Amino acid sequence: MDNNIIIGAMTALITPFKNGKLDEQTYHKLIKRQIANGIDAVVPVGTTGESATLTHEEHRICIEIALDACKGSSCKVLAGAGSNATHEAVSLAKFAQEHGADGILSVTPYYNKPTQEGLYLHYKEIAKSIDIPVLLYNVPGRTGCDLQTETIIRLFRDCENIYGVKEASGSIDKCVDLLAHEPRMMLLSGEDAINYPILSNGGKGVISVTSNLLPDMISKLTHFALEEKYIEAKKINDELYNINKILFCESNPIPIKAAMYIAGLTPTLEYRLPLCKPSDCNLAKIEAIMKNYDIKGF
């Protein structure tokens, strides 16, 4: 497992649409741009990829495109494979493995509010259905349930292919507590605002929204921190403060998709309802802040 774990700078990919349908050509180009700018892994069909409003067929196509785009490169594919129905999550995980994904990211079940025992059994079922690495994903602000430290550690110790967790609870204390109790755990930041604090407290990588727009900066920040060059890492983190903040002025991925469109990286600005375009006020703020950054094209 040690040789197969997926850490470092990762991008939670947006899913571009054109005339209401998946824009496969743009999606492929966006991934190639990530690879060219030093990203270690891409994460298709997660929260940022609007997975909740994709059909199962679109979900699978996104994974296939990511695998094709990363072929022959060192960039890995950590495929989104989450659902609030365990059997669906298992099916998505199996698809990812069968098609060559390097690992899966699986969010906690949303809406049905399982107990900690239910969460344990959910992830145990997913883990035993595949052989590739599994990264837990805790984002209670969106799912309505919090994967507690004790449950994370229990899963890590009981399931050989569960290697870590993407923590997006916003709690540095929880992250420090987790690593204090299980230092072998691979902890990844799931929130751009706290990338540096997590990396400087033992985290092993980030799954970033901002890196859709600025993959080179997120890659440098992450690798400086992993090399314990904390002064250099903090300098980049400070430079990213304003863009990180504005990219969450509305629900993710509303602002990042707007930013990608403004930067000319996507030909259209489309969402799947109930997500919609940002307010004119926020759109103007996003555009103004973007002028302070060197955003690389294709």
Swiss-Prot record:
Gene Ontology MF terms in the entry: 4-hydroxy-tetrahydrodipicolinate synthase activity
Query: Looking at the keywords, is Lyase present?
Result: yes
Site-annotated residues for Part of a proton relay during catalysis: T47, Y111
Give residues annotated as binding pyruvate: T48, I207
CDD domains referenced in this protein's UniProt entry, alphabetically: DHDPS (cd00950)
Q: Which domain of life is it from?
A: Bacteria
Top enzyme class of this protein? Answer: lyase
Instruction: Say yes or no: keyword Isomerase present.
Output: no
Q: Which reaction does it catalyse?
A: L-aspartate 4-semialdehyde + pyruvate = (2S,4S)-4-hydroxy-2,3,4,5-tetrahydrodipicolinate + H2O + H(+)
Q: Which UniProt keywords apply?
A: Amino-acid biosynthesis, Cytoplasm, Diaminopimelate biosynthesis, Lyase, Lysine biosynthesis, Schiff base
PANTHER family according to UniProt: 4-HYDROXY-2-OXOGLUTARATE ALDOLASE, MITOCHONDRIAL, DIHYDRODIPICOLINATE SYNTHASE
What's the protein called, per UniProt?
A: 4-hydroxy-tetrahydrodipicolinate synthase
Species? Campylobacter lari (strain RM2100 / D67 / ATCC BAA-1060)
